[in-house]
Amino acid sequence: MRDTLHSQYLNEFGDRWIFAHGDSTSSALYSADKLADRWSSPTPLFKKSEGVERANYPYLMADGITLYFAAQGENSMGGYDIFMSTFDLDKGVFYSPENIGLPFNSTANDYLLAIDDIDNLGWLVTDRRQPEGKVCIYTFVPTASRIGFEDTDLS
């Protein structure tokens, strides 16, 4: 199998690149930083043991610390789910990712969450309640409260 670049995110300053790389069965997120005119060697953001498989569609908030991405894995509700991780400035690594739960995740594929803190708008890309091969982009106003996946009873 041939490895490919699946999706990528470049911050507004053009000096932080986060991308999904892998093959048709698995992918992981990597990051590289631009120093002067050169990019650093890509480094994986998470260990394989952190329960995230087929990571894709990264989005780094303007704070440069909060990362949202879609992934499948043992902590998924179904299909792709949105996960969040924050960057530890002291250690220079991302914390273990967490499934952000309802209402952003569902049993369908939830691909991308992007939030504009300045204009207080968010976008969710999902295929829930869509015909095969189609997605819907929901626009929403972010709030401070959310239900965590681990706090949700889906039975």
Where are these regions (language model features)?
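Short, conserved micro-motifs composed of acidic
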Residues: 1-155
